[in-house]
């Protein structure tokens, strides 16, 4: 893996001003190494694939590999890392892997909540029912928006 040749990989990335993609995946003995540190000032890129170790290599459908909902505690590690590095780099991106049942959206909502970023948009009732942690973050953001609007009315 390219993470096994760390010095060579970082030299190549630096030569092209390219960011190391911080990948989260199930941890196997041959998994990509992860340190969550930025290697370039301009860009930080984190991608969360999920930790579905049971279906990672053996699955009936390709999407089964990414069928994973992170807990709030698991996401806190990534939110904390993103919060720390966004003060050091130009742009910070945290991507959650797409999954047909909107787990990526639920994970992204919780990350935004942990980062105290705005949570906008409309979410179907079925989504709110299925993902209670995301639903609580969405409802709290809506209450905060309503409070700000109410506070401005003379």
Residue ranges and their predicted role:
Residues 1-154:
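Residues lining hydrophobic/aromatic ligand-binding pockets adjacent to catalytic sites
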